[in-house]
């Protein structure tokens, strides 16, 4: 980890890395997905999902601290160079898939709500070029964007939670706990895509100064993200009926239409436009992680791996044309995330700790 020292950042910045990578485009429309199983109780499911993420982050820290490096180092130490590199490559492929999903979802929102005739390829190129410029500046620049994104998130959601009181229906959420625990768990499972982003820790850990003592900032980051998701779901349920939620794809954008200020109209346009910094922050972290991972595995220069991944992302974005295809791709991403980060990583962490303690004896 000594070779990373010049690029390392302060531990508190991990809070902004986690929150900026977790709070993305999914927060604009996840309410419809989580309410399918738990109805208005789905906000409880978000809290459950957040607690599960906190546990997974704890496992990640145990793994990374024992490996004294990133996930690639952990895999190589346990499985050897060839098998370890192959397993690491699967995680890097997930990062690429996740970046494509985030990019295409945001472009779809812009096309539906703002510019219906704008081409997918044009927006893809503009956003990917911005991300390429940021990632080329190094990890500290990527973290700087994440920091700005985190500050922006706090301001944006403060405005977005300025609810029009005449539309609030408190009886919507009553009675609480009206669904079974099984329904709550199914709803929590459906929030996996929205809660994703914390897995970036597997690659950024060596770049955090005093990484072993930085866990509290990661856990607080997850807790803050969970709070934002919970408030987002809760306030959406106060304003919209279950029928409305079922048919509105992006509930928070729909609610933004109800927000009015004396000096500002069409708040949803401001919301969508401002969300670009969130998208760029997430993409920069994902592209940095995947391009650096390829550099470590194949010994290529990172600028070439970054160009390669950006081109792949651009091409796949053009292939996802319909709402069904985009939604199916997001579901596919969520499924991969479930098996890798909620199942494999905790198991691998436990086995790695056992192996480490066995060698110590």
Mark where each language-model region is.
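Hydrophobic alpha-helical segments and their helix-loop junctions in multi-pass secondary transporters
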Residues: 96-99, 103, 135, 151-177, ...
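Alpha-helical transmembrane segments of helical membrane proteins, especially in multi-pass transport
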Residues: 91-94, 228-240, 265-314
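Membrane-water interface regions at transmembrane-helix termini and the short interhelical loops
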Residues: 105-111, 128-149, 207-211, 292
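Membrane helical hairpin/interfacial module
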Residues: 27-120
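Hydrophobic, membrane-embedded alpha-helices of multi-pass small-molecule transporters
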Residues: 9-29, 45, 49, 53, ...
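Helix-loop-helix connectors at the membrane interface of multi-pass transporters/channels
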Residues: 103-121, 207-228, 286-312
């Amino acid at each position: 980890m000594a070779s990373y020292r010049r690029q390392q950042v302060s531990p508190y910045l991990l809070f902004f890395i986690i929150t900026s990578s977790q709070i993305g485009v999914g927060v604009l429309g996840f309410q419809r997905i989580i309410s399918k199983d738990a109805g208005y109780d789905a906000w409880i499911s978000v809290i459950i999902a957040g607690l599960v993420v906190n546990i997974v982050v704890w496992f990640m820290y145990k793994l990374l601290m024992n490996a004294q490096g990133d996930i690639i180092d952990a895999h190589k130490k346990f499985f050897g160079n060839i098998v370890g590199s192959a397993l690491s490559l699967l995680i890097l492929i997930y990062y690429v898939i996740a970046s494509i999903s985030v990019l295409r979802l945001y472009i779809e929102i812009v096309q539906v709500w703002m510019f219906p005739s704008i081409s997918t390829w044009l927006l893809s190129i503009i956003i990917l070029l911005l991300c390429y410029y940021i990632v080329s500046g190094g990890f500290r620049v990527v973290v700087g964007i994440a920091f700005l994104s985190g500050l922006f998130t706090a301001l944006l959601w403060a405005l977005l939670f300025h609810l029009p009181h005449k539309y609030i229906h408190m009886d919507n959420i009553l009675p609480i706990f009206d669904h079974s625990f099984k329904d709550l768990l199914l709803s929590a499972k459906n929030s996996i895509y929205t809660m994703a982003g914390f897995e970036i820790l597997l690659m950024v850990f060596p770049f955090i100064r005093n990484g072993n003592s930085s866990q509290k900032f990661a856990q607080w980051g997850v807790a803050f993200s969970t709070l934002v998701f919970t408030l987002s779901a809760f306030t959406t349920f106060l304003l919209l009926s279950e029928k409305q939620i079922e048919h509105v794809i992006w509930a928070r954008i729909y609610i933004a239409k109800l927000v009015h200020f004396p000096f500002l109209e069409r708040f949803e346009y401001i919301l969508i436009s401002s969300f670009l910094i969130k998208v760029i922050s997430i993409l920069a972290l994902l592209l940095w992680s995947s391009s650096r991972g390829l550099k470590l595995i194949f010994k290529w220069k990172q600028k070439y791996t970054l160009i390669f991944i950006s081109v792949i992302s651009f091409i796949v974005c053009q292939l996802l044309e319909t709402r069904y295809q985009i939604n199916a791709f997001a579901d596919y991403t969520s499924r991969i995330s479930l098996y890798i980060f909620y199942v494999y990583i905790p198991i691998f962490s436990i086995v790695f700790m056992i192996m480490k303690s066995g060698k110590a004896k």
